């Protein structure tokens, strides 16, 4: 007798091949059989007639490092079919750190991860894992190279000394030994934006030739996106490692429809030459990150206190105005999205609550200031603890990336403690299947499922994940594709997706007829 028998469904097994009629049996947390099991019995039988049965969805790019400890965590994830997530992305992992620069690191991460509680601060990844509560979904972690650098050298612009590199390498090796699934870079963020390409290669020396994935938020994602792809291909070739480009996009209207075909061609050529490369994309034209991200690299030196002093200096602010106007060497989001395309989604000071959900342009009009002055004054008042939602990408580019065989779907979900998060926290998986598969026909259902399952599992080498096959982990979704509904909007983001008939995590029922069961059967996934 099996533990669970899912009868009569249409199985989209994660590989992208056409769906087929089959029963799926589960025993001991694993898939025990797939096929015609009409004579079999089980302790729990599900009728999946008229439904699609898929592997549990996988999001290898979230920022829930600290949110795992919040009451109610898991609802946003499970209701869209997620059974496995990976945190620590963009170089911004909540561990390991804990030295003299710990407070500065927590301040820097807060607009993205939310407040990191003191009990979660630890100088080892093993210590971080030990602090986690029972988990509703499976969770993996990347070693954030930005946090590793900040832990040994702070947020200074100076080139690292030999001793810094030795300390950085020890931390990286320890994190990998503790189970990090790979290494993440955030070259658009401090302090990694201070690296030259050669320095970056030196910093990553411990993973050379080790088949350890490197995921990358590239140095530029606007007009310089192709140069950034070229830089990362050079790094990956020299280190002989797998490369995965995070949230590939071309920011700015002038770049839409032009840069992404070039970038995809570069990645495909590298793949054809034998490199292990891939990329991912989120299914929205708006992103979300620190408002601080609008600043050029030289303005980020020294951490939040130094940034605030710099922004308060009239001469420095004038320099900033020229840098934003002239651009060059960084993603000039103020120009790429426009002040009317940058919205304030997380604020902390009571006096600023009136601006929540407003654009910088709207805030400026309310304050009778220029947009730059309003933005700088807000960053000063909030000590840079502001999250933005910025509209800067094109749906045609998203579709092109989705069509690439190299891509998978991610959310890049950020978890600010206050305010209005991006709706992608709640609906990325559902949006892919509802909008890009069902409404626009960019992908077949089977290909859409592959982008959510086997492809991300391959990217980070997640054994037993992403496929319906005998012996695989029993992370499963049952749903009617026509019934899926994203629900969340930019105005009302905190609405869980609808349409999941059942979601199983490790062979235990986590969602039943759209409702959470309260089961927490997730586990920590280690390399």
PLM-predicted stretches and their roles:
Residues 90-99, 111-238:
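Hydrophobic, small-residue-rich alpha-helical packing segments that form membrane-like cores
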Residues 1-56, 71:
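Histidine-rich, glycine-flanked metal-binding segment
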Residues 9, 24, 29, 50, ...:
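Divalent metal-coordination and catalytic microenvironments
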Residues 9, 313, 400-406, 411-412, ...:
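C-terminal cap of metal-dependent C-N hydrolases
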């Amino acid at each position: 007798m099996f533990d669970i028998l899912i009868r009569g469904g249409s199985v989209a097994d994660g590989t992208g091949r056409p769906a087929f009629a089959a029963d799926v049996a589960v025993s001991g947390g694993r898939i025990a059989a797939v096929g015609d099991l009409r004579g079999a019995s089980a302790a729990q039988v599900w009728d999946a007639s008229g439904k699609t049965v898929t592997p549990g969805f996988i999001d290898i790019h979230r920022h829930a490092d600290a949110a795992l400890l919040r009451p109610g965590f898991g609802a946003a994830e499970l209701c869209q079919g997620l059974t496995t997530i990976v945190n620590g992305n963009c170089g911004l992992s909540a561990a390991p750190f804990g030295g003299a620069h710990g407070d500065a690191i927590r301040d820097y991460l807060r607009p993205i991860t939310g407040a990191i509680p003191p009990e979660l601060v630890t100088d080892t990844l093993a210590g971080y894992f030990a602090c986690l509560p029972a988990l509703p979904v499976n969770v993996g972690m990347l070693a954030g190279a930005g946090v590793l650098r900040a832990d040994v050298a702070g947020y200074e612009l100076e080139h690292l000394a030999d001793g810094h590199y030795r300390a950085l390498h020890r931390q990286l090796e320890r994190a990998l030994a503790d189970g990090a699934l790979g290494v993440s870079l955030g070259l658009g963020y401090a302090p990694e934006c201070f690296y030259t390409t050669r320095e970056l290669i030196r910093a990553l020396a411990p993973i050379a030739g080790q088949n350890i994935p490197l995921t990358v938020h590239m140095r530029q994602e606007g007009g310089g996106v192709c140069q950034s792809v070229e830089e990362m291909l050079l790094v990956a070739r020299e280190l002989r490692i797998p490369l995965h480009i995070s949230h590939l996009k071309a920011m700015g209207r002038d770049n839409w429809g032009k840069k992404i075909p070039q970038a995809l061609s570069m990645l495909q050529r590298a793949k054809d030459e034998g490199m292990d490369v891939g990329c991912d994309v989120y299914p929205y034209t708006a992103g979300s990150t620190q408002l601080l991200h609008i600043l050029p690299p030289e303005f980020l030196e020294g951490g939040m206190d130094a940034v605030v002093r710099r922004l308060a200096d009239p001469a420095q602010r004038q320099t900033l105005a020229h840098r934003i106007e002239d651009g060059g060497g960084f993603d000039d989001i103020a120009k790429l999205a426009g002040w009317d395309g940058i919205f304030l989604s997380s604020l902390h000071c009571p006096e600023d609550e009136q601006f929540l959900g407003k654009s910088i342009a709207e805030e400026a009009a309310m304050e009778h200031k220029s947009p730059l002055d309003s933005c700088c004054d807000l960053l000063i008042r909030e000590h840079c603890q502001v999250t933005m939602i910025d509209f800067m990408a094109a749906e045609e580019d998203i579709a092109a990336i989705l069509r690439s065989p190299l891509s998978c779907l991610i959310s890049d979900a950020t978890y600010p403690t206050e305010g209005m998060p991006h709706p992608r926290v709640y609906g990325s998986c559902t949006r892919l299947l509802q909008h890009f598969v069902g409404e626009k026909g960019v992908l077949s259902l089977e290909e859409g499922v592959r982008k959510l399952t086997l492809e991300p599992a391959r990217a980070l080498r997640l054994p037993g994940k992403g496929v319906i096959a005998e012996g695989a982990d029993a992370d499963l979704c049952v749903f009617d594709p026509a019934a899926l509904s994203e629900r969340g909007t930019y105005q009302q983001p905190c609405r869980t997706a609808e349409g999941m008939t059942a979601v199983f995590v490790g062979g235990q029922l986590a969602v039943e007829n759209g409702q959470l069961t309260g089961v927490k059967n997730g586990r920590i996934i280690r390399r």
